[in-house]
């Protein structure tokens, strides 16, 4: 979660173990640990988020959040595929939301995999240039 939070290609990280989480203080008082599931928003759209997930090699893509293997899902396409973007937004599900259940793999390997997958997607500056070019 800390690695993702510092990345410019991640807009937001949802994990109660982070000091930046709005309920971190409550979680610290009530929990003995913060769990192995982290959700985050990729800085991009539905397609960019899918590209990020496709570039990962460690986690399996799937809706389950419990097991020894790392599992990841693009929430809009796996859990809310039958809803339109507008319907998903109405319940707070953005197209760039990712849910990642961390397994027993080596943490350094997981971070390296996240790093290479993030490196493979365009940054905000490049996306802004593309958008400006298409508007002209």
Segments (PLM) and residue ranges:
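Short acidic amphipathic segments
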Residues: 1-13
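Short linear functional motifs in flexible/disordered or boundary regions
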Residues: 9-12, 64, 112, 126
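Conserved PLP-binding catalytic core of the aspartate aminotransferase-like
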Residues: 12-80, 130-134
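Short coil/turn connectors at secondary-structure junctions
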Residues: 8-10, 34-35, 94-96
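PLP-dependent enzyme catalytic core of the Aspartate aminotransferase-like
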Residues: 54, 70-136
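Short glycine-/small-residue-rich flexible loop motifs, especially phosphate/cofactor-binding loops
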Residues: 1, 50, 85
């Amino acid at each position: 979660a800390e690695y993702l939070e510092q990345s410019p290609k991640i807009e937001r990280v949802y994990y109660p173990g982070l000091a930046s989480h709005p309920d971190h203080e409550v979680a610290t008082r009530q929990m003995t640990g913060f769990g192995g599931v982290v959700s985050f928003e990729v800085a991009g759209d539905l397609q960019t988020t899918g590209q990020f997930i496709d570039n990962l090699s460690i986690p399996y893509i799937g809706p389950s959040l419990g097991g020894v293997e790392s599992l990841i899902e693009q929430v809009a396409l796996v859990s809310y595929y039958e809803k339109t973007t507008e319907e998903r937004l109405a319940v707070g599900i953005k197209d760039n939301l990712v849910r990642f259940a961390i397994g027993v793999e080596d943490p350094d390997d997981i971070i390296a995999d996240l790093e290479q997958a993030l490196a493979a997607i365009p940054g905000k500056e490049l996306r802004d240039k593309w958008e400006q070019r298409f508007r002209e």
